[in-house]
Amino acid sequence: MSKPEHIGRKITGSITAEIHGELNEIESPLFAINWFDTRIAIVYHLYNLLAASRVFKIGGKVLFKGKCGQAISGNTDLARHYLLIVNYPSGHRFLELLSDKVFQLMSVLRIAAVKRFSFVLHQRQGEPQLLPDGKSVIDPGDHYAVLQVRLPSQTNQSKAEAASFDFSALQRLAEQHNSQVFFASRVAGQVVLNKDKQNEADAMPFLTDVTVLVKSATAKNVLDCFASDQVENLLPAGAEYFAAQVKRTM
């Protein structure tokens, strides 16, 4: 991979937001992986309702929202209760959202409502990279499970490892258990907030170098798909992971 670059935008008088990654990726459609717990769930849901119009205004669309249920396997230190995946037309449009003063006011609710918040921008493996207009239809008979993978060190080397991650092996694993990969992605860009006057930079923390969602007609299929003996043999040496059922709500 070439030397990582970045794009940026001033979002307040003293803070510039940047996305660090390869320009050909972060200037393309991206998927924001929000993986978190809540302090006050009702406040978070209120924030979502209020912020939706600002996200839609810049072309953002929700791909998936769900609450984790039964843990399947892996390191529970990586576990969170909620997963939200949002598609953005490009990194530039996402930075436009961060600079929206109304969105910034609404984000006060999110900060108050969530904890152990992991956020990173991913590139999807496969299509569509940019979701079509219109709401997706949720089949109540579908069952989902998520696999979150953290690579050994979140550095330029780990981005290279994520780029070469063997998604085809997970596809075959899903098929063996009568399941299908609904969504698969890997890290493309990390958000960094620069405090201009203090010359300080704060990178938003994230746990998820790779995210994979599978779905099936039965809960047993997705549980079996991400059982520990199935997953561990497919991951790079030193990688950690967590897998859980997810109840889709959007």
Walk through the language-model features, giving the residues of each:
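Short S/T/G/P-rich N-terminal loop/turn motif that feeds into the first structured element of a domain
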Residues: 1-82, 89-96, 115-250
